[in-house]
Amino acid sequence: WDADSPGGKLTIRNCRVESTDELTGRTDGIRVGSNSELVIENSEIKLPHFRSIRVGGNGSIAVRDSDLRTYGIFMDETAQSPNDAKTLKRLEITNSTVLTGDIIGARGGYSSVEEVVIHDSSIRLNDEYTYNYCTIGGGTNGSFGSIDIQNSQIHIPSSGGNTAIGNGWQVYYNRESRIRIANSEVSVRCASLGPAIGAA
């Protein structure tokens, strides 16, 4: 499903979505454009290999009371310099189960996320994609504002060179960031010399 027009809102509520697309290298499963809002509530969504849930720059995503199997949930924007950088305004996952193969947050060069909220949810990295650079937070050379994880289970056994919870590879921005993890079970690992939680 593709609605790549800016400033829109897509709501998926009380639905069961299972894609039967052939396996490809594309990463579009459900997509909305820049400055758009994507809301998934009380739904079950299963997307095949490399199919993801995406928003454009300066968008937001909310997942509530849902069960998702997807390649990732992210803003996918790559900039050539910090001057052109894009930001995911807010990502909320509440009372949901997510099996992911890639980023939860911002994906791409200089891409950042302002706020991530994960409450009463389970997020696991799919065993098929343990080679991926999976991060909850900002993208390559990007940053994050705040990450709040409460009453949840997070399992990311390998994040490649990325930080599992925080920013992606090689943070560029110098900014104040906050991570709060409360009443949760977190199992994460980073394959490089950087931290598993925080800023690489």
Role assignments for model-derived ranges:
Residues 26:
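Beta-rich catalytic cores
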